[in-house]
């Protein structure tokens, strides 16, 4: 074996899913000493129908048995609650829409889990993420690359990883398409070969999100207004809505009036009729008002500039200013933009085309081609003509 594939002790995060299972198998096939770790990150109501880690552990243990590796059950629930869930609640209480999976990767899977693996004498860790790591021969820096399967790429969720973390990390399935991963799992007889991909936030599972959040954040009803200031109904609490949201607004059947349609025509918004869907455009925390607009192309849903804070750069320092691409939400196509300013504290992006429903609390992640440069948490954008000239969440 060459140095890259010489035998190493590698600890794999086995989730019970097919991606981490194939990850462990591929590394074992390369001759490495592979140890599986099942991470338990949530304990509250974990025996419920929505989110049971016990079922996932049974699947992970069955995989380990087929592959022929050891598996250990490790509880990181306290770390998760302190480092991830507490921040998740603070952000929702402030009216923003956080992405806990990004923080979970940075604080749990590639910090607490990595530390545990190193105590076991591991040289590397591996997970079933669809991303790639490459060491730049010219700079010596480790680069985070998109996964080869564009429909499964998860580099967006990994953009906060640093050089120390990437230097110890392997993403074997990032070099494959999902169909290939399923085929390998079928061929070697993995018991979870056809297991459905996990969706949503692990501690919420398949339950209604609003019901879950209401266990921790009290409802605070207030008015729902359109862009003309007309009251359309009542919301249950601003924390329970996100910018761009269309479903669950409680104003189904409300039609635009003549004055509303004339206002839409005056601002050049074409094709808006009385039955067009409504979207959340602004959350005014001071007045507890939820502002909604009609039509997907409403100006209140369009932004060409954004400011992000708490930026993290994969290389350890901010990239050079200039042309690049960015995503303001997962699964969004790369959008051409210019990095106008960048520090560890924050950055400003100017987009070539208007971006839809740029949401404070979500992450803006930057790319140069297939290389993920890092990113930050969206703080504000330049949505025009909002009431009072305030930001979309304020």
Swiss-Prot record:
What general EC class does the enzyme of this chain belong to?
transferase
Could you mention a single GO BP entry for this protein?
Answer: tRNA wobble position uridine thiolation
Family listed: Belongs to the MnmA/TRMU family.
Catalytic residues at 104 (nucleophile), 202 (cysteine persulfide intermediate)
Mind giving the lineage of the organism this protein is from?
Bacteria, Pseudomonadati, Pseudomonadota, Betaproteobacteria, Burkholderiales
Show the disulfide pairing.
Answer: 104-202
Signal peptide range equals: none
One family name in Pfam for this protein: tRNA_Me_trans_C
Please give the name of this protein.
Answer: tRNA-specific 2-thiouridylase MnmA
